[in-house]
């Protein structure tokens, strides 16, 4: 019994010795690799989203120029994403001049059902597409949904949010940017 315990203990110890993610002489973090791409390139990203018609694509060139923009990464079955959509639509008078790009990685039927349920076709400034190439998650290093990236009229990043935000928080971020310039 003692020998079995010692054997298991020795195996466990060697596991921890060899489980180090990097060599001892390497720096703990490489700033170029640690920084998310959206911080290195703080403008509208080159996304490529499959539109609801499942034949054409939504790209950054389809976003109206000289307008504030929100890129919202969401999941149709996420309760926080539903609440965020509800709050934006409830306060839509303040969002009607903001381009909203809603992107998801979830299956097409779920995305279409979400679009229909919230009657997003009634809002021409809201565009939706499926991130089939899974570009946005690593680009923003998304961990929580909904994820919101706010851009000014010039297409420059203002800030990002993870999780449900009050509409006043979103609108204040835009206002601070405009009044700070």
What are these regions (language model features)?
Residues 15, 50-51, 151:
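Hydrophobic alpha-helical segments, especially N-terminal targeting/anchoring helices
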Residues 144, 150-181:
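Thiol-/selenol-based redox modules, centered on thioredoxin-like
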Residues 23-61:
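N-terminal "domain-start" segment that seeds a small globular fold
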Residues 118-149:
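Short, internal strand/loop/helix patches
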Residues 82-120, 135-138:
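Structural microenvironment flanking redox-active thiols in thiol-disulfide oxidoreductases
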Residues 59-82, 88:
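Short active-site neighborhood of thiol/selenol oxidoreductases, capturing the structured segment around
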Residues 1-24, 177-181:
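Bacterial Sec-dependent N-terminal signal peptides
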């Amino acid at each position: 019994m003692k020998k079995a315990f010692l054997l298991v203990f020795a195996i466990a110890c060697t596991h921890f010795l060899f489980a180090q993610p990097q060599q001892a002489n390497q720096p703990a973090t490489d700033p170029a690799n640690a920084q998310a791409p959206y911080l290195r390139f703080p403008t509208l990203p080159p996304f490529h989203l499959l539109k609801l018609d499942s034949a054409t694509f939504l790209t950054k060139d389809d976003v109206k120029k000289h307008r504030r923009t929100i890129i919202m990464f969401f999941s149709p079955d996420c309760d926080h994403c539903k609440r965020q959509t509800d709050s934006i639509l409830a306060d839509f008078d303040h969002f009607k001049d903001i381009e909203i790009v809603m992107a998801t990685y979830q299956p097409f039927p779920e995305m279409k059902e979400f679009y229909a349920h919230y009657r997003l076709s009634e809002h021409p400034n809201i565009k939706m597409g499926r991130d089939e190439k899974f570009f946005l998650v690593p680009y923003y290093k998304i961990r929580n949904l909904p994820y919101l990236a706010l851009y000014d009229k010039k297409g420059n990043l203002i800030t990002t949010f993870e999780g449900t935000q009050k509409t006043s928080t979103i609108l204040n971020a835009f206002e601070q940017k405009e009044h700070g310039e």
